Amino acid sequence: MRNSRLAIACLLTLLLTLGACQSEVAYHHYRHVSSPGWDKSDTLHFNIPPVRESGNYEMLAELRTDKNYPFHKITLIVSQTVIPEGKSFYDRLDCRLINQNGVIEGDGISYFQYQFHVRDMKLNKGDSIHLCISHNMKREIMPGIADVGICLKQKETGRISDE
């Protein structure tokens, strides 16, 4: 009987510890890209509402593609302005969609979903973000891009860079 109580206590401790490391999603939204594809001049805008808590956050860019996307990679340009501070960040992401063996790295069957780390940032309670994202490919119109999204997650633990 004592061993089973100890086992249950250990299991509960493990579950609580793992649960404490979870990230809380503060914002998650997609913008649809109209046919025939994502135009280089079509910058997508996201207005992330004020965060409820001060803390460390992780910004992710997300893509949904279909079989019509013609390349193995895509380069994304992400610019962010934290309001009211006015601090701006500019990130260039070189995103691999298909590996060297021709295997799609996204999740899905007819549409493939990808997530790419943009940056970690420290935000204060009430900070909001205006974010713009565009592609930086030589081809003007990128077929096969269905949706572009942004996810902001609050990080519970770990170190953060504030670049």
Model-derived features: positions:
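Short amphipathic, basic-aromatic surface patches that mediate peripheral association
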Residues: 61-68
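Bacterial signal peptide processing site
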Residues: 22-25
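Noncatalytic modules at the cell exterior or secretory-pathway interfaces
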Residues: 53-61, 121-137
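Bacterial N-terminal signal peptides that target proteins for export
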Residues: 1-10
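Short coil-to-beta strand junction motifs in C2/discoidin
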Residues: 70-77, 144-146
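C-terminal motif of bacterial Sec signal peptides marking the signal peptidase cleavage site
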Residues: 17-20
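An anionic, turn-rich surface loop/hairpin at beta-sheet edges
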Residues: 92-122
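Post-signal peptide N-terminal segment of mature Sec-exported envelope proteins
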Residues: 29-51
